Structure formats: C-alpha cells, structure tokens
Design a protein with these regions (language model features):
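ATP-dependent helicase/translocase motor core
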Residues: 2-277
Length: 277
C-alpha cells in the first residue's frame, strides 16, 4: 500500500464523516470550543428556551459542568437539569437525546489546547457542541498503542474543562482501529476493543469502522444504551460488540415473542454485564 501520512489519513477520515452527515467546523482553540457549545446547546434546547440564555444563566450552566471528574461528567451528560432563569421561570434542559435525529453532529480537527504543554488534538466529534468522541490517529505502520500513550499524555497535561465529557476514544492507524471508554484512571490497551459486524468479522479499517460504528444512529445508541456508569468503582465502561449484539437479541426476544431468553458464553466474556443491560 502507498505511503499515507497522518495528515492525509485525518483529512480522509473527516471527509468520510462529512459523507455520513456530520457538519465540519473549525474550532482552533478551547475558547472557540466553549463558544460553539453555547450556540449548539441553545439550538438543541430551542423548543424549551423562549429566549437566548443570559450571560449569568450561561455561567450557571458552566459552573454545573466544569471542575468535575470524567465519571461525574458522564452522569451530568445523561441527566436533565433545572435552570432557574433570571426572570424566575424554570426550564428543564438536557445535553443530548437518544433519538439521533434530534442531535447536532459536528466534527473538527487540530484544535490547540494549552495545558502544561501546548497540544493539538487530531479529530474531535461533537454532539450538540460537546466533545464526546476523541479520535487519535497515527500514520500507517505505526503501532496504535502509540495513540493510547498519546491519549494518556493529553489526559495528564491538557484534557480538562469540557474535554472531561469525552465518553469514547478511538485510535487508528488506518489499518487497525479500536475504541475504549474514557476514565479517571490510567487507560489500559487491553481495554481497547475492535468493533465487529453481527457475524463477528472485525472492522479494523478506519473507513469500515467509521461507516458502522460512527453512523449517527449507532454512535448515539452506544452513548445512551451501551455504556455503563459503574457507581461502585466510579468507572465509565463501554460494551464490546458481541455484548451489544447479545443485548439487542435479548431485547428482540423479549419484545417480539414475549418469551424468555438467556445469555450463554465462556467464562470472562461479560455475561453479567450483558444481563445487567
């Protein structure tokens, strides 16, 4: 295969997401990220807001969101909250919807964030303005474990503020692609998973992975149905593909046939987690 630089892979990936219905947007820095979030948040909640948020109301929302752990941010993301407006009225607001058609999907790249060091993030997927999926790419031939190491460096030095709302990381060198859940803990490469189709065929190529995993309806299902907030360990978890397909099969069995079903698999496969979902 011909040589492909990381920059070429990145642009090819963004073009693929554009074809899948994502809007492309330039977000050069963190301030621009916050500004875009405000615009998209108001647009997403337009049916509940009869007028734009005031500066004080927006500050109140940011105070609710910022300074929290990854786990706390994941809980906030999935909860509705009551905003008391300056005129005394109250309104219930939310950050995203389980119906993918009601959300705003954007993709940006090369956002520069200043922490202990100056870092430039590869590709960020935004849902209603919030950075929920972060993609780190390496050129073909580079072990994707290098991307995990890069994520860890970013988490240590600059993944703060709204970036605590990242739910899923995706790493790829174009040929091999994996995903894993964000965490307040050190990330382990063993918890990064390949995605597969229903017949358990791995979709390792970044384009094939994007078409399946990052389809707008599917990624919303992953975020709303197939992630677990482990309150005991304060841990965010994402399900493996066979667990997702097992849950979907169990739900179909229960809803369409009104009959019972069971999970059968090997030790350590995640039967308890699948049954829980």
């Amino acid at each position: 295969m011909a040589y492909q630089s990381e920059a070429e892979l990145e642009l090819q990936f963004i073009d693929q997401l554009y074809k899948q219905g994502y809007d492309t947007i330039s977000i050069p820095d963190y301030d621009a990220l916050v500004e875009n979030f405000k615009v998209q948040f108001e647009a997403f909640n337009a049916s509940k807001l009869d007028k734009p948020l005031t500066d004080k109301e927006w500050e109140r929302i940011l105070n609710l969101m910022l300074g929290k752990s990854v786990f706390q941010s994941a809980k906030i993301l999935r909860d509705k909250f009551v905003l008391e407006r300056e005129d005394g009225s109250k309104v219930y607001l939310s950050f995203f919807d389980s119906d993918h058609t009601k959300n705003i999907f954007q993709v940006t790249h090369q956002t520069t964030v200043v922490g202990k060091y100056v870092n430039r993030y590869d590709v960020t997927i935004l849902v209603n303005g919030l950075p929920l999926i972060q993609v780190e790419l390496k050129r073909r031939g580079i072990d994707i474990r290098e991307a995990v190491n890069q994520v860890m460096r970013y988490k240590k030095h600059s993944y703060n503020g709204l970036y605590h709302f990242i739910q899923i990381f995706i790493i790829s060198n174009g040929v091999d692609t994996k995903y894993f859940a964000n965490s307040d803990r050190e990330m382990l490469h063993s918890l990064a998973f390949f995605w597969t189709d229903f017949d358990n065929v791995r979709l390792t190529n970044l384009k094939d992975f994007s078409i399946a995993f990052l389809a707008r309806d599917h990624i919303i299902k992953m975020l709303t149905r197939y992630m677990i907030l482990n309150d005991t360990d304060k841990l965010l978890m994402v399900m493996r593909p066979y667990q997702v397909y097992a849950v979907e099969a169990l739900v179909r069995q229960a809803t369409l046939t009104n009959r019972n079903a069971y999970v059968w698999h090997t030790t350590g496969a995640g039967k308890t987690l699948t049954s829980f979902k």
